[in-house]
Amino acid sequence: MATGFCSSFGLLVVLLLKNVADVGAFPSVPLFSLFTNAVSRAQYIHMLAADTYRDYERTYITDEQRHSNKNSHVVSCYSETIPYPTDKDNTHQKSDLELLRFSLNLIQSWLNPVQALNKVFSNNLVFGSSDVYERLKYLEEGIQALMQELEDGSFRSFPFLRPPYERFDINLRSDDALVKVYGLLSCFKKDMHKVETYLKVMKCRRFVESNCTI
């Protein structure tokens, strides 16, 4: 009888361990960790964009070009064609899913341009020695994971209203092209700041222990 009990108990343990292994084969990542990773990635990309913009300005742009560019629209930022929240109050009025969709759309609008820009710069510029495209893809995946978590597996990004940054001259031998790329880098920096802000707002709203000084 004891032998039978031991055999049955042993079989039960094996089955329980098997079930635990099956359930834990693909463990879910806590929502806090998903937000923390996304915020960290967005912060890095925004810092990279700001450093690249500053280095490019210092290397290629004259004082006259810099001042004239600030007062003109050499390159129209794609994000200006969509009513993204641009201030603190408007951002807080949007739901987490809306902010995630905005963020995903912004990230996806830059996947092609950064590949073209990456081929232009020499290694003394931040872009030339970075893996910005890969980091954008990682952030895209992180945002999609958050959307899946909040939407129970179904999500759709906003359709592009027009092809973003499809046609721009990256021949740096031309002064006009230099200024256009300068404008693009300015747009990239602004858009990555938006993404970072949106993610921080979402994390702040959901987790009390997060830094909420936004």
Swiss-Prot record:
Residues 1-25 form the signal peptide. Its main location: secreted. Disulfide bonds join 77-187, 204-212. Gene3D superfamilies: 1.20.1250.10. GO terms for molecular function: growth factor activity; growth hormone receptor binding; hormone activity. The keyword Disulfide bond applies. It is found in: Secreted. One of its GO terms (biological process) is positive regulation of growth. GO terms for cellular component: extracellular space. Keywords: Disulfide bond, Hormone, Secreted, Signal. Growth hormone plays an important role in growth control. PANTHER family: SOMATOTROPIN, SOMATOTROPIN,PROLACTIN. Belongs to the somatotropin/prolactin family. This is Somatotropin-A. It comes from Xenopus laevis.
